Amino acid sequence: MTTSLYKSQITMFIVMVIIGMLFNPMNILAYRFTDLYISHTLFYGGVLMASNMIWGHEIVHYLSMGHFNMLSFSIGIALSISTSILLLREQLLVDDNQWLRRMIPHHSTALTTSHKIYNRTTNPNIKALSREIINTQEKEILLMKSML
């Protein structure tokens, strides 16, 4: 592999990680823009999304060129999946501050979905539950922000 091709692929992967972080579905559901934080867990999710995009691209590219190698693909996909699982499930390098930075957007997502169902539902049980979730999540977000 030439140096310029290698640099190009690294650059493409970095761009995909950034896109994966910015367009994380959970971030899109945040109730307020001020509830969004960059965290290690968000980065790890971006790495997972980027590796998925890369492998999808590689499969299509090599199948269309007739150069698909099942062994290389299997090793690569196993490494990508195991690395992503290790980073996300084990929460490597995630300390108290990093945990709070990911939990605030998570709770903000609950606000978005709960506000929407509260305004749409006619079921009194769902309305009461969504109101309780809204109140609880608002309090927890304020507490977490004060701890940062």
Place the predicted regions along the sequence by residue.
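His/Met- and acidic-residue-enriched segments that coordinate or traffic transition-metal cofactors
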Residues: M1-L148
